[in-house]
């Protein structure tokens, strides 16, 4: 387990629901997808680069995802990742994306 975090740390994160509208191979050293995610009219679309290789690119398109949208951009090889899609590492080494269990409005905040 990680050390205890300050209670306000979680409150600083802006975690939103978005829908993957495009998933394609990223130009990175490790196998990675470049996903364009729609967060609704307030935030628009953002790009995330992630190692969700246990999914086919076409299977990611249309999927709702949970993402942190206020971490700033991160350089990943020649790609820029604007948001962090949250997921769980599974025993096979892949990552399973977290998603809401029902259809919620794009841009909804996770609380």
Name what the model sees in each region:
Residues 1-111:
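Phosphate-backbone binding interfaces of nucleic-acid-interacting proteins
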């Amino acid at each position: 387990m990680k050390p205890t975090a300050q209670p306000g740390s979680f409150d600083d994160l802006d975690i939103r629901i978005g829908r993957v509208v495009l998933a394609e191979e990223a130009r990175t050293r490790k196998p990675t997808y470049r996903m364009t995610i729609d967060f609704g009219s307030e935030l628009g679309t953002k790009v995330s680069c992630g190692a969700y290789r246990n999914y086919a690119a076409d299977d990611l398109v249309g999927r709702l995802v949970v993402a942190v949208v206020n971490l700033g951009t991160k350089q990943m090889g020649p790609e820029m990742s604007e948001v962090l899609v949250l997921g769980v590492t599974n025993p096979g080494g892949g990552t399973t994306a977290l998603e809401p269990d029902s259809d919620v409005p794009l841009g909804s905040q996770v609380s």
